[in-house]
């Protein structure tokens, strides 16, 4: 077991990606994947899985601030189920509330408005989702 995890920040146009190690509790962004109405290029996902060979995949679960589901919640669940169904890897959903806000803030601090491109924000959100998962002791 390599203790490598891959995280996705699901979106309808762009899906953020991060890779992390359970042993260090750290994650780093990978290039975001473009999506067509929430459907990714599955061959790109397959390549990521072959390259990184994660033990587990974490998919951010978008919830409202009060914990209730929103329209994107069901789509993120469907994305997670499809990954599990296609590739047979363990997939865990993890609360992603405020991850995009935190990602935008961090990127802006480091590079101003120029740093706020969509793919960077989505992958930075995936890093935050994965690090939050590690912080909760998983």
UniProtKB/Swiss-Prot annotation:
InterPro entries: RNaseH-like_sf, YqgF, YqgF/RNaseH-like_dom, YqgF/RNaseH-like_dom_sf. The keyword Nuclease applies. Keywords: Cytoplasm, Hydrolase, Nuclease, Ribosome biogenesis. It is an enzyme of class 3 (hydrolase). It is found in: Cytoplasm. HAMAP family: Nuclease_YqgF. This is Putative pre-16S rRNA nuclease.
